[in-house]
Amino acid sequence: MNKFDEFIESNEKDLDVDTSTRNSIISMSPVRKTGRKIRSASSNGYRLEHHRTSSAGSMHSQRLMTPTRLNDQDHPLQAKPDARRVVTRHSSVSVPNAMSKRRSLIQPMVVPTTPESQNNLPSVSHSEGSYGIPLESTTVLSSEQAMASGLRRSRNGSSQSVNSMIATTIPTNGVDVSALLQSLATKELELLECKQKIEDLKKQTQHEEQNYTRRARELHELKEQVSKHLDPSLNTPVKNRAFSPVYQNIPLESRTENAGNSSLPSSVSKPKNMGHQSTNQSRSVSPQDIQERRQRDDSSDSSKQSLWSKPLALFNQFDKIIQHEIERTLNWDDSLSGTPEVQEGTPTSNSESSAQQYDNEAPGARQKSPSQGSVSRSLWSFVSDVKAGLLGIEEENDNDVITDNRCDPVYKSDRQHEQKKSTHKITNRGQAEDSGDDSSLNMRKFKTTTKFQKDNAGNNSLTDESGHRTREKKSKRSSNKLSFIGEPDNDNSSVKNSVEMTDF
């Protein structure tokens, strides 16, 4: 039961009125005493206009708001006190009004009837008012019949409620399907929009990549142009670029003489050329700050040229002088195939020793010029004079004998001087052995003219008592003297070494 049925039952209890079911209609006249037999509800049908069905399935008659008062004689339930009392209605004006009010609140549901029940309905002569309700009718129903009819109507009501539930669920399912279809359509549209956006972005990226490659190519061309303007050596061929500016600043004479040799200066200049080429290549490819780096490199190149060009040129000239002097001394002019004789204790610097080693590798490739021979002789005379002056100053400051590790002077390039060299070595070696001086066995010492004269005067004034000490001192000091051409021998020819002096 729902709330509406509970409300109706509570009102019926308060008013002491039963409006549950009316299955039979009996027409009665108020004057007639002998009443008809009441027909059972099972044999009689019911009129569709007289009934309504609640949601629970029970049949109720429409309740009168203003029931009429009946007399004791006219009351139909006097004979059967156990029967339920039903209100009799006379024709009055208030009945249609009450029915209209009740119908406005309750919408009756029509229960389908079978043809058999319609045929069983008796033809009742009565006068019908509005809404098909008889004006004079009385219904009597026993409690058992009312209960049976209530059960049957409840079953019909339950089946109708199930049908109504099915009818209500079908449209809801339809609404859900339409919503699903709508959401599906929206999702498809979103996917299409996403695909379109992806395609647009791909096209945009391709366009940007093309612009990037084009701008990179333009930038590379501009870099090449700037590098050509800043470094003119890049415009020259690769063969000409292989020569460094250091090698270009060397005099032409020395370059032509060293053309056929894999010489030390060439080996020094090649790494510099390679470094110069690599720096040029890196500068041409450098991505940023090209002008600043070019200016720095140009300034560094100019500083390198100023630092290294002159020393290397002097080194090459000095190398040539030493080479020709050694050739002249060792008589390579006569026999170029002979092995050179190593001089004992020649005082040369690191550059001179490396140059001599380099010259010994390819002696046949050298050529001699008369002008360079004169220059070399003048240079050697100047060097020997400087050495003699330095040794004279040291001996004047110190009275004791100071042995200096010096090397032999360079002799003339004739056979006679070679023979003199061998004889001088033998005499000096014998004197050194007699005097006991081991340092003079392998070393030659220079002597100056002033010291030579002083030693001669001192030796003449010494007595024979000094003996061995005097001879030792004489041999030591005489070994440090230099005798020049044109001076008297003074009986010491074995210790004199002639030094050639020529004017520049």
UniProtKB/Swiss-Prot annotation:
It is found in: Cytoplasm. The modification Phosphothreonine is found at T236. Keywords: Coiled coil, Cytoplasm, Phosphoprotein. Signal peptide: none annotated. Residues 32-62, 252-306, 332-377, 400-504 are annotated as: Disordered. Pfam families: TDA11. It comes from the Eukaryota. GO terms for cellular component: cytoplasm. Residues 257-287, 332-359, 368-377, 491-504 have a biased composition (Polar residues). The keyword Lipid metabolism does not apply. The modification Phosphoserine is found at S244, S286. Residues 290-301, 403-421 have a biased composition (Basic and acidic residues). Residues 470-479 have a biased composition (Basic residues). Residues 179-231 form a coiled coil. Disruption phenotype: Leads to cell death when overexpressing the camptothecin mimetic TOP1-T(722)A mutant. Belongs to the TDA11 family. Present with 504 molecules/cell in log phase SD medium. This is Topoisomerase I damage affected protein 11. It comes from Saccharomyces cerevisiae (strain ATCC 204508 / S288c) (Baker's yeast). The lineage of its organism: Eukaryota, Fungi, Dikarya, Ascomycota, Saccharomycotina.
